[in-house]
């Protein structure tokens, strides 16, 4: 109980910080400081080590580099939950698993409905399938202890499965031309990490060094570099012996150490460099285009319809039960909150459209609007339900 309470408090603070940096990015992009903001995003950063040369603008270092650390953390969370947490049994995983599948299928179908026949636009079909766990849990934590713990666990489990789905989508659908040499180096790195895991090697620095080699090789391979973070996480031992012979969990220690860095530095920085939408160039006509409508309605309508609809079916068919001490309206309110795509949707958007501004920021504004509508509506639904409980 204390662990979950502490986690939710931290996510609440992180969510508030994400809002602040998003507003700051919007102000900078739409003021006399827009040139300085754009220049900051495209600041060249180079790394040379012998024959190795990596040169990218700051924006891509954040998206390819820092977000790999974020996905490393997600990988650690998934591993812990599957091995000993809320996803460790079929009974625990059934409802959030089915809900997560619905929350990916329905938004994707809505986007496809608006954009079928447009090959480039269709690259963005996965944008509305994502959920931003920091924001969604942040909204729940603002409602206090009156929201049943079972619903918070449901949302946490659903979000983790949702993130796992995003990882699979990135691996399958957002991979470019492959480099055989780089993939070979990545495979060798993974093999070494696997052997270290099986031999119970308990040296963090060894995993980090091999992990960096893995990241560089994946970056050069054509597979998105963030997947290196997930692969590395799955190779970190859940339990090892230290030099004194005592058992400890390297995976849990790394997860704990990274949480604050991810919540208060990496995700806010990602939001800052990606949420700077140029509102001056966006018209009502642009926002009524198939891509913005597919994204916005996919997030606000598709996510809640998919999560709640699939949950309702699973419960009515006897495959799962309603979370303890909750109601259908509470479950619906949480389902609406899953439409907060924000950072995850922005990330998929950057992959889908390769950071081009072909839609003149309308796609990104649609993400912000869909996420805001989901956050506000979900909060109000749960708030009214809370008041009803107070009165009773």
Swiss-Prot record:
One of its GO terms (molecular function) is sodium:proton antiporter activity. InterPro entries: Na/H_antiporter_dom_sf, NhaA. The chain crosses the membrane at residues 16-36, 58-78, 93-113, 124-144, 153-173, 176-196, 199-219, 257-277, 295-315, 328-348, 362-382. It is found in: Cell inner membrane. One of its GO terms (biological process) is regulation of pH. Pfam families: Na_H_antiport_1. Keywords: Antiport, Cell inner membrane, Cell membrane, Ion transport, Membrane, Sodium, Sodium transport, Transmembrane, Transmembrane helix, Transport. The keyword Transferase does not apply. Belongs to the NhaA Na(+)/H(+) (TC 2.A.33) antiporter family. NCBIfam families: NhaA, PRK09560.1, PRK09561.1. This is Na(+)/H(+) antiporter NhaA.
């Amino acid at each position: 109980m204390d662990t979950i309470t502490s986690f939710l408090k931290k996510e609440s603070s992180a969510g508030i910080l994400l809002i602040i940096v998003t507003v700051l990015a919007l102000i900078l992009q739409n003021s006399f400081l827009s040139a300085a903001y754009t220049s900051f995003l495209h600041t060249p950063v180079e790394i040379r080590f012998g024959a190795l040369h990596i040169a990218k603008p700051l924006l891509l270092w954040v998206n390819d580099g820092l977000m790999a650390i974020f996905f490393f953390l997600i990988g650690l969370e998934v591993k812990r939950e599957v091995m000993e947490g809320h996803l460790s049994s079929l009974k625990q995983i059934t409802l959030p698993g089915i809900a997560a599948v619905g929350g990916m299928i329905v938004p994707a179908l809505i986007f496809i409905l608006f954009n079928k026949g447009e090959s480039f636009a269709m690259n963005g079909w996965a944008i509305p399938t994502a959920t931003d766990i920091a924001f969604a849990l942040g909204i729940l934590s603002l409602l206090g202890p009156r929201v049943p713990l079972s619903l918070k666990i449901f949302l946490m489990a659903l979000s983790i499965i949702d993130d796992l789905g995003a990882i699979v989508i990135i691996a399958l659908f957002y991979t470019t031309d492959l480099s055989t040499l780089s993939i070979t180096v990545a495979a060798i790195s993974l093999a070494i990490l696997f052997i270290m895991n099986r031999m119970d090697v308990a040296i963090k620095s060894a995993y980090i060094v091999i992990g960096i080699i893995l990241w560089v090789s994946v970056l050069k391979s054509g597979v998105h570099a963030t997947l290196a973070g997930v692969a590395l996480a799955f190779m970190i031992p859940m339990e090892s012996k230290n030099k004194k012979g005592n058992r400890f969990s390297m995976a849990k220690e790394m997860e704990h150490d990274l949480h604050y860095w991810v919540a208060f530095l990496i995700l806010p920085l990602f939001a800052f460099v990606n949420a700077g939408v140029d509102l001056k160039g966006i018209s009502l006509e642009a926002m009524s285009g198939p891509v913005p409508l597919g994204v916005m309605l996919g997030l606000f309508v598709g996510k809640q319809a998919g999560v709640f609809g699939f949950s309702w079916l699973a419960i009515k068919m006897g495959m799962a039960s309603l979370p303890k001490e909750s109601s259908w309206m509470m479950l619906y309110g949480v389902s609406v909150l899953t439409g907060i795509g924000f950072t995850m949707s922005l990330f998929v958007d950057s992959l889908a459209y390769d950071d081009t501004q072909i839609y003149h920021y309308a796609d990104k504004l649609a993400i912000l609007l869909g996420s805001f509508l989901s956050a506000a509506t979900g909060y109000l639904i749960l708030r009214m339900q809370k008041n009803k409980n107070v009165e009773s």
